[in-house]
Structure formats: C-alpha cells, structure tokens
Amino acid sequence: MVFRIASSPYTHNQRQTSRIMLLVLLAAVPGIAAQLWFFGWGTLVQILLASVSTLLAEALVLKLRKQSVAATLKDNSALLTGLLLAVSIPPLAPWWMVVLGTVFAVIIAKQLYGGLGQNPFNPAMIGYVVLLISFPVQMTSWLPPHEIAVNIPGFIDAIQVIFSGHTASGADMNTLHLGIDGISQATPLDTFKTSVRAGHSVEQIMQYPIYSGILAGAGWQWVNLAWLAGGLWLLWQKAIRWHIPLSFLVTLALCATLGWLFSPETLAAPQIHLLSGATMLGAFFILTDPVTASTTNRGRLIFGALAGLLVWLIRSFGGYPDGVAFAVLLANITVPLIDYYTRPRVYGHRKG
C-alpha cells in the first residue's frame, strides 16, 4: 500500500479573504448607523468618498505593478481600509482630507510594502495619523451629538460643507461646531483633557453638556456600544478571535480604574475610557487585523494588553485626546518580537 504525504497546511479554512472582509464590513453597520444618528449625514458622505478613493488608488497602483486589478479589488480589503478611516475622522472634514488619508493608506502603507499580507502597519491608522499630525485642528473638530447640538446639517448641507466649507444658508464650520449656549463642543476625551489642563475639577467637568450621557459622553457611549455589538457578532461568526479584544479592554479598564482611584481629580473614570473615542472600534475592528497583529494566542493576549496600556497612557499623559491609532501602530512594531518569543514549541523538541 502506498501512502501519499501531502505538504502542509493539513487543515483548511474555506473562508476566503474577501468573505472575511465582507463580514467585517457587515459588522460595521451598527457602528455606522449610530454615527449617522448622532453626528449626521457627513459620516456617510465620508464613507462614500473614502470607498471611491481607496478603490481608485489601489487600481492605479496595481495597474502600474502590472497585477490583476479586478481580482485584487474583489478581496474587499481596500473598502475596509477606506471605511475604517472614514468613520475615524470628523463627519464634516474637508473632502480632500479623506482622499489624502486613504490614498496615503493604500499607496504608502499597503502597496509600497507589496500589498495585502505584506504591510507591517495598519494602513487605515497610518492614514489617520498622517492626517492628525498634519491637520490637527480639522481632525479634532467633531460636531456635538444631536442630543446637545444646535446645528446638525442634513444630507445636502453635509455635502456642501464637505466640498465648499459652508451650507446653502451660509453657515460655515465655526457655526456648525457651536453647541449649547454657543460653547464649542469636542469629544468627551478631548474636553476632559483640555479642561483638566485648564485647572477645572473633575466634578465641574462632569457637569458639561457633553457628559450628559448615562455612562460616558453624550452620543459617544451609544456609538461605542454599537461598535461593541458589531464586534460581538464578528466573534460569533468566528471572523476574529477573542484574545486581542478581551486583553485590550481588560487592560484599559484595569489601568483606568487604578489611575482613577489614585488620582480622581486629574484622570478620567474607567467608563469614559471604555465608552468614548475609538475604544470599541479599535478593540474589534482595528487591532484584530490579521496581517498586522500577533499570530499566536499568547502573542495576541500580549499584543492586546500592550495596546490597552498605550491607549491609557496616551489619553492620560500624552498630547492627544484619544490615542488608539498611535497605540495600534506602536503595538504593530512589537509584533515580530512578540511572535518570536511566543511561538509554540514543536512537538518532540526541547525549548530553546
């Protein structure tokens, strides 16, 4: 009898890359819907802009590299990159910003390294950080959520603001950014950091309209819960593994709790960290990128915990209010080292 020994891999996953990417896109629907509800139609316009620009940029590079355009675009990775960047920037940011960010993400952060599977850094976060460093004012100019907002532009007005800087009635960005009593509204994390530096007490800060939510900032808590719902669905579909989200959230919660207990007058409470900013989006949709995250189970736990620690440190002591994007990229740098020291021992061989 002749036995044929096939080469590895010996187990096969029937789900192709395009299907996994499609599942992630579908899981993003609750988060997108929440952002549309609280921040207006600008989010949808940015998603459409980002989708078109990422596809065009990827097609151009593939054409120059003489690779199959149609086959590569079908993997949906470019669409996901555009989506993640679009939901991370303010809804009424100028059109050229999302185009610049997505083009940089696709061409420099992805295709320059060889395309999908070769890039060491998350492309969407590279694009986001480039925009944040280059245009900090525009990237931190979020509308107040509709619960406390005076002006939330409709679909047509959102298009006009994004492309021309003002609505049909003449309202410019400064007018639209004004919230209750003419006070400019930022994100809960940005408001907290700015107010603490100005010498305000936590008790005073918690009286601001932006913190009128039940658990955290108005609107932002529901946006984060919506992204959490999508992330749990991804876990149920087994499109992602639990190690990174769990270790990230547990570490962030633990650091925030300890910091708040030791310094309640200067550091934010744990619920603000967990339900504000890009916490849930980062935990389930960004950090779990299979290309740029650790590949071993122990490594995933370390990777997620490191990102959680970095997010808390940047939010609490850094110069930027959120920190998820920087934490992701810094954690990406450590992946080769983490994988090297957490690689499983080959059966029958001694360690070392």
UniProtKB/Swiss-Prot annotation:
<keyword id="KW-1278">Translocase</keyword>
<feature type="transmembrane region" description="Helical">
    <location>
        <begin position="322"/>
        <end position="342"/>
    </location>
</feature>
<feature type="transmembrane region" description="Helical">
    <location>
        <begin position="267"/>
        <end position="287"/>
    </location>
</feature>
<feature type="modified residue" description="FMN phosphoryl threonine">
    <location>
        <position position="187"/>
    </location>
</feature>
<keyword id="KW-0813">Transport</keyword>
<keyword id="KW-0285">Flavoprotein</keyword>
<comment type="function">
    <text>Part of a membrane-bound complex that couples electron transfer with translocation of ions across the membrane. Required to maintain the reduced state of SoxR.</text>
</comment>
<dbReference type="InterPro" id="IPR004338">
    <property type="entry name" value="NqrB/RnfD"/>
</dbReference>
<keyword id="KW-1003">Cell membrane</keyword>
<keyword id="KW-0997">Cell inner membrane</keyword>
<dbReference type="Pfam" id="PF03116">
    <property type="entry name" value="NQR2_RnfD_RnfE"/>
</dbReference>
<feature type="transmembrane region" description="Helical">
    <location>
        <begin position="89"/>
        <end position="109"/>
    </location>
</feature>
<feature type="transmembrane region" description="Helical">
    <location>
        <begin position="301"/>
        <end position="321"/>
    </location>
</feature>
<feature type="transmembrane region" description="Helical">
    <location>
        <begin position="42"/>
        <end position="62"/>
    </location>
</feature>
<dbReference type="GO" id="GO:0005886">
    <property type="term" value="C:plasma membrane"/>
</dbReference>
<comment type="subunit">
    <text>The complex is composed of six subunits: RsxA, RsxB, RsxC, RsxD, RsxE and RsxG.</text>
</comment>
<dbReference type="GO" id="GO:0022900">
    <property type="term" value="P:electron transport chain"/>
</dbReference>
<keyword id="KW-0288">FMN</keyword>
<keyword id="KW-0472">Membrane</keyword>
<dbReference type="InterPro" id="IPR011303">
    <property type="entry name" value="RnfD_bac"/>
</dbReference>
<comment type="similarity">
    <text>Belongs to the NqrB/RnfD family.</text>
</comment>
<feature type="transmembrane region" description="Helical">
    <location>
        <begin position="214"/>
        <end position="234"/>
    </location>
</feature>
<feature type="transmembrane region" description="Helical">
    <location>
        <begin position="242"/>
        <end position="262"/>
    </location>
</feature>
<keyword id="KW-0812">Transmembrane</keyword>
<protein>
    <recommendedName>
        <fullName>Ion-translocating oxidoreductase complex subunit D</fullName>
        <ecNumber>7.-.-.-</ecNumber>
    </recommendedName>
</protein>
<feature type="transmembrane region" description="Helical">
    <location>
        <begin position="123"/>
        <end position="143"/>
    </location>
</feature>
<feature type="transmembrane region" description="Helical">
    <location>
        <begin position="20"/>
        <end position="40"/>
    </location>
</feature>
<dbReference type="GO" id="GO:0055085">
    <property type="term" value="P:transmembrane transport"/>
</dbReference>
<keyword id="KW-0249">Electron transport</keyword>
<keyword id="KW-0597">Phosphoprotein</keyword>
<keyword id="KW-1133">Transmembrane helix</keyword>
